[in-house]
Amino acid sequence: MPLLRSSQHIKNTYWNIPKKSFRTGVPQFAESKKTRILHLHPLCKSASGVESPPFFDSQTFSSISNRKEFRKMATTVPQVVSLDPTTIPIDYHTPIDDLSIEVKDISAEACPADEGLIVFLLNSAPKHSSSGGSGGNGGSAGSSGNGEGGAQIKINSSVKDNTINEFLKEGNMENFTGKLGTSKSFYIANDQKKYVSLAYVGCGPANEETELEIRKVAYALVTLLHDSKHKKVSIIFEIKIEEALFRFFLEHLFYEYVTDERFKSADKSTETDFIKNLSLHIANADAYKGQIDKARVYFYGTYYAAQLIAAPSNYCNPVSLSNAAVELAQKVNLECKILDVKELEELKMGAYLSVGKGSMYPNKFIHLTYKGAQTGASQNEKKKIALIGKGITFDSGGYNLKAAPGSMIDLMKFDMSGCAAVLGCAYCIGTIKPDNVEVHFLSAVCENMVSKNSYRPGDIITASNGKTIEVGNTDAEGRLTLADALVYAEKLGVDYIVDIATLTGAMLYSLGTSYAGVFGNNDQLINKILSSSKTSNEPVWWLPIINEYRSSLNSKYADLNNISSSVKASSVVASLFLKEFIENTPWAHIDIAGVSWNFKARKPKGFGVRLLTEFVLNDAV
């Protein structure tokens, strides 16, 4: 019996999924769109107040016109034994789908205090001051307490309850300083003698809120939400916050609130009381209402990417990942093309194909396309963009095995984070549907394994642009797959090429776990990415491509080596290598090796989805 087989008797292959999930009983392929497909909440209103129907309920899928064509693009996942997984379980329905959100002007309407949880977001008081304001959102009740440095924290807002307003006036801030990420909870009776939960969440000093601080605030708030189990929650913003940061706050609040339990044997989600109503009380509310829909879309895109990254490699392999991309394309009406090994051979993608030779799973090249409507006077106004994500579903290092301490081989399922970010962006763009932009979502997906067929150190391989590469290290595989993907992208005739990849561990030492690094050959393009970084609140830092180091990639026998012979700046060297496969197109490379994974929480961040989406939208009209 051959070791590698595709059993015809397995009933849970990708296109024959049972109606019930193996873990939760959530309907899979044959159920209604309402529970299967990502969508905007039916009650979600736009800035104009017009209710929007669920996105997918109003769409027709013309790119993949029928089930037969859909099946044709997908591939049966190879198995060694019949119990091997054949699909990536993805939760397309989350508690956020059922969450009704309202944004209310705190200066015009006080927060009700009849039931549920009321949370005050508070800045710490200024140091060395006897009194201070927290944001000036207006109101009648006042409260003071000891802040940092002996100063006072003051609440300016009121609620629709005299008893609670009196409680707020009394202070009750002992041991609460407003320090970032801290909280204090109360359980008190209101005028109707019903008990109401109150909480303070510290946001740190005023005017210092950034992406990093908002993450901590959201995490502290989520802890309160899970502990309280209230279905109705009101959040009173006693802080000033920019619109983009407000949106990011919601995105991260949603992301932290949803728990990934796909691989648990019991369905714990049914035992949880999820919130159903969320009221956001903030000054100048009209300016923030338009951010709600966008926050939902960005959350879904990020959570979708995170699910792919978190899926272990026996579930997420090149075939199952490409199948997931096909399904996504159908759902958001994208054109879809999956290139198999034969087609890749015809394109002479020798660098990419070499990396996957040791795996039981064949290479799969994902190409999804979004074509926005042309609304301008000239067709030339339509920007064409290629986004490339590194898609190594597991990186053992190959014959240069990740065996050294700190090599984190157990985490190498995350080496397809770039691909996940691109697919998450594809969801967002397919949902928002911007005009005057065409986007190609690309990923050269494979697995870097050790076997008798694996490529070896010292091999000389030929990329699709004809350049020969000496393999100095099989663990520098990502740049080989990206090389052929860059050549493919440039042939599409796009205006910009942006690749995103967990490429070099050196990013952990240069920028740590908070900032991604961006390299490129075009200052204007990099500035666009930096601008998108600010509006998406996904931090990126511009790093140089130092041409002086190019000679360290020289090979005695080939055109170049895939690693440097002398230079230790491996992130810069990797960028120099990629640059060899770009001719004239403006190109940027984003290295997310340090920021993709949340090491403390032991889960992915989904980094890059918002950044890439903002980048695309900034070029759309």
From Swiss-Prot:
Reactions this protein catalyses: Release of an N-terminal amino acid, Xaa-|-Yaa-, in which Xaa is preferably Leu, but may be other amino acids including Pro although not Arg or Lys, and Yaa may be Pro. Amino acid amides and methyl esters are also readily hydrolyzed, but rates on arylamides are exceedingly low; L-cysteinylglycine + H2O = L-cysteine + glycine
GO biological process terms, semicolon-separated: peptide catabolic process; proteolysis
Propeptide: 1-73
Positions that bind Zn(2+) 1: 395, 475, 477
Enzyme Commission identifier(s): 3.4.11.1, 3.4.13.-
Location of the region described as L13 loop in the Swiss-Prot/TrEMBL record: 400-417
CC terms in the record's Gene Ontology section: cytoplasm
Residue ranges, compositional bias (Gly residues): 132-150
Domain notes: The L13 loop movement regulates the transition between active and inactive conformations by repositioning Lys-402, which, in turn, mediates the rearrangement of the binuclear metal center.
Designated name of the protein: Leucine aminopeptidase
Organism, scientific name: Plasmodium vivax (strain Salvador I)
